[in-house]
Amino acid sequence: MSKWVYPILSIPEDKLAKAVIKNIDASVRDLYNVCKAIRGMNLKEAREFLNNVLEEKEALPFWRYSHGTSHRSNISRKWKVKSGRYPKKAIKYVLKLLDNAENNANSKGLDIDNLKIVHIAAHKGLVLKRYMTRAFGRSTRKYKYLSHIEVILGEV
């Protein structure tokens, strides 16, 4: 089994708060774009942006895995991308992860108003392989793909 390792950052360990969620039932493709959008934001800005996407006031830009994604009129010009979606399931997991990281920062005694998302990434997780029975004694494979998300908050 492989060991989970966070990336090495130049910020001292006592100024960081980390959190990870493993084996969630959300698309890695959606999680990638959510993570890219909020990377480098303050914690409050990221929460506000993600809540706006959940309420469909603002679309989440899709840089990658955007084939067939339609253009949205409510994407901000700062993203320099026209195509976007509203990946609600992925956003709910990311908001839960940000809450966990904020609680970890609070228990470390960090100032919550000055927290910034230093690192956030989505990774492929387990693949659950199952079989669905078909007619005439045949079967079809059925895959369920799981994902991991990790976040590191730093005090600025």
From Swiss-Prot:
Database matches in InterPro entries: Ribosomal_uL22 (IPR001063), Ribosomal_uL22_CS (IPR018260), Ribosomal_uL22_euk/arc (IPR005721), Ribosomal_uL22_sf (IPR036394)
GO biological process: cytoplasmic translation
GO cellular component, one term: cytosolic large ribosomal subunit
Keywords of the record: Ribonucleoprotein, Ribosomal protein, RNA-binding, rRNA-binding
GO MF term list: rRNA binding; structural constituent of ribosome
Stored Pfam families: Ribosomal_L22
Subunit structure comment from the entry: Part of the 50S ribosomal subunit.
PANTHER family assigned: 60S RIBOSOMAL PROTEIN L17
Role this protein plays: This protein binds specifically to 23S rRNA. It makes multiple contacts with different domains of the 23S rRNA in the assembled 50S subunit and ribosome. The globular domain of the protein is located near the polypeptide exit tunnel on the outside of the subunit, while an extended beta-hairpin is found that lines the wall of the exit tunnel in the center of the 70S ribosome.
Family per similarity comment: Belongs to the universal ribosomal protein uL22 family.
Stated name of the protein: Large ribosomal subunit protein uL22
Native source species: Sulfolobus acidocaldarius (strain ATCC 33909 / DSM 639 / JCM 8929 / NBRC 15157 / NCIMB 11770)
